[in-house]
Amino acid sequence: MFIDRAEISVKAGKGGDGAVHFRREIYEPAGGPDGGDGGDGGDIILRGDRNYWTLLHLRFQRHIRAEHGEPGGGQKRYGKKGEDQIIPVPCGTIAYDAETGEYICDITDHGEEVVLMKGGRGGLGNTRFKTSTNQAPRYAQPGEPYEERYVIFELKLLADVG
């Protein structure tokens, strides 16, 4: 079966939340803030692959999601970045936004990669908000939300014989 058009929903990952945490060690009852930053959300990446000839593999995969970033931790531990979701497409694939009809990209070569959607940035931990006047901040920044969009993939074909 030859499929030259597919419409799918893609979601980038949400950024992890920053942590509110305070240093606690023996003989040091009032340690300062040490909350870590949240990890970035995963990206959605299109990659040209000469081993694919049609968009059949996308026809039955209607929703593609990247991983969310993990929240930060105590002792200034950063959250892990969400894993990127790589979508293999045949060379000669054009991507459009389904709602606006806006052209997004054109994959022409094998191995060519285009970031379709960026994941959300991770939030900052309370260590980042420490100042000379506020030495123990009790707040951290939440991670940025994810993006969602419907994308149409079209495979352009060049006929050798008419």
Features from the language model and the residues they span:
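Conserved P-loop NTPase architecture
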Residues: M1-V161
